[in-house]
Amino acid sequence: MLTLTRCHHLKQIAQECLSSLLVKVQSRTQLLLPRASARAESGKSWHSTHSLVGDKNIVLMGPPGSGKTTVGRILGDKLGCCVIDVDSDVLEKAWNMSASEKLQDVGNERFLEEEGKTVLNLSASGSVISLSGSNPMHDASMWHLKKNGIVVYLDVPLTDIISRLKSMRIDRIVGQNTGASLRDSLKHVRLYYKKWYDARVFCESGASAEEVADKVLDVVKRYQDVDSETFISTRHVCLKDHDKKFPPKYFSEAVVEGLASDGGLFVPEKEFPKLSPGEWNNLIGATYIERAQVLLERCIHPADIPAAKLGEMIETAYGENFACSKVAPVRHLSGNQFILELFYGPTGSFKDLSLQLMPHIFAYCIPPGCNYVILVATSGDTGSAVLNGFSHLNKNDKERIAVVTFFPENGVSDFQKAEIIGSQRENGWAIGVRSDFDFCQTAIRKIFNDSDFTGFLAVEYGTILSSANSINWARLLPQIVYHASAYLELVNQRFISFGSPVDVCVPTGNFGNVLAAVYAKMMGIPIRKFICASNQNHVLTDFIKTGHYDLRNRKLAQTFSPSIDILKSSNLERHLYLMANKDGQLMANLYHQLESQLHFRIEKMLVEKLQQEFVADWCSEGECLAAISTTYNASGYILDPHTAVAKVVADKMQDKSCPVLIASTAHYSKFAPAIMQALGIKELNQTSSSQLYLLSSYNALPPPHEALLERMKQKEKMDYQVCVADVDVLKSHAEKLIQNWFVRKSE
């Protein structure tokens, strides 16, 4: 193994970095993650005579007609504090005329400037301030207000706003351009509101002012309670000594560390947030980006990532990187079956839905002064998606974060290998391993749990290891969004009404994708059954049917659907933890037994509980190819082999009493040889690029994936490394890359 003597100051920095990750700090000001600095910079202290506001203000923001004035008065009564309405108490008194008269007098631009200057003179503490609808369009005045308060956005449905404005005989608002409709103008000013709010009240249609005021109090309480949303290991045991050794983590810490130090996976300590039916209804006509922001705001505390920053990340991830404007559209296949198309991202697989966002979350959460290496095991699609996602970081972040992807050299399709190699960038490398995915995944876990090695990297190179596999909570979280969005799309397209149940069928290997659907149900999406679809490596199907997870005498089979050629299903542990009422000791026992004896069995009560929501079956190679052929002949639609596995199992298991959403996890062109075999195309001995162009000529659905064609061209120019299946060898490769990227660059 390589060693390199570094100077004393680097060792000191590295040791401080490591301790910032591994030691639970007691004070918010001591924490080196953004959660602490964000709280310190905002200066929001909420302990004073008023239980919520103290000497700070609650600042209500929203468009005209959102109810700010009425809600502000109710809050003032509830909190016993002063209420300031900017329109009537500030602007009209300063101008000696109404805001509408002033607007008529000076016009839009001058009005906004004079309004902003007037608000800059406002000085208040311990008050509720109801802004005008146009205050957020003046940056300086909003910064002034934010310094001494929490800005709460009253996000009221547009239909309600327009109805209220009509009843008030208002047909124009500040900032409305000539010829623009009221609806379009309201949509435009929303962009300003999203820039400033600290917390959002997502108002149901027709909600009373009293109900909205109660929600304001709820979001302010959540905002001030920075310790309320923590994460624990699935192997957490409620004992004093254990709590000291393995304390709860904040979201930022869970993201950076990736894997819990006791070998378990991070999960929320408390229940998942749940949206009401009315809140879900507000999202039916929303864009994917809007849905993502509302849902992820509920799951990530603003002390970890402020709402405005989270919104920027989501816009960056999904704004222009997907070939379809809907990001994850739903297409009717036939009968009661619908395809959730998850392959429009830059690498053509469902992994892009997480890995276009997760790198930005990770880069924001890491503490200063350290370098990070993301270790990834891939069964095919994850590797290229991780490499692509982290390549989109800004220059400064790329200098601090590097990616090493290990993939089974002979266990992915030729196209997947080409794509992984072609996705390498200056801060990301691919290494083929002469073994299978399970070895790669197990090896990475062993590396993470090797405290001598991780400590050595921290001290010698100032570098910390982390993960981007679905064991990382930030990888799993964005997947909840597309399962929820798929249901909302069915409602939006009027196939169902909200509240009607659906089944979800997912080709399953590592259990993360289907687990995200479970979490979507916990948030309020009415999913009836989860259909787990396996290929010939059907250990999960057998487990769901019997409760016995048995790896003895099993050998991993290479199939047409390599991304689910997995025997050790990591995320199953998270679901078992939920079913077992968060029994961390049971999880530790089960997975220690799996490690030592290659099997475990859960008790009958848990099997029955599992089978209440889960059904499972598997698909042979012949059935997979037949499904591709028959579906294409019937509809002109080409399924990739993983989606074909799900289609076969959905046909077997679904009772057709409700719609079934089939997760299509990859674009078919990534598996051209299997597709050509299924469709009876004889020209199999072609290059991967030629196969891709040949399939494109069929004019089938879905359309060709242009980014994949481009990636194939890049592959020819890139080298990659191959190593034997030895954990120490993988460590050595990781260390060499750390030297090449971080150490030599700094010398």
Swiss-Prot record:
Name positions with the PTM N6-(pyridoxal phosphate)lysine: K351
The answer on whether this UniProt entry bears the keyword Ribonucleoprotein reads no
**Coiled coil ranges:** none
Mind listing the UniProt keywords for this protein, alphabetically?
A: Pyridoxal phosphate
Q: Per the entry, which co-factors are needed?
A: pyridoxal 5'-phosphate
Q: Name one Pfam family in it.
A: SKI
- Keyword field contains Membrane: no
Q: Where are the transmembrane segments?
A: none
Q: Which InterPro entries match?
A: P-loop_NTPase (IPR027417), Shikimate/glucono_kinase (IPR031322), Shikimate_kinase/TSH1 (IPR000623), Thr_synth_N (IPR029144), Thr_synth_N_sf (IPR037158), Thr_synthase-like (IPR004450), TrpB-like_PALP_sf (IPR036052)
Cross-referenced PANTHER family? THREONINE SYNTHASE-LIKE 1
In terms of HAMAP family, this protein maps to: Shikimate_kinase (MF_00109)
**Hey, which family's this protein in?**
Belongs to the threonine synthase family.
What is the official name of this protein in its record?
Answer: Threonine synthase-like 1
Q: Which organism is it from?
A: Mus musculus (Mouse)
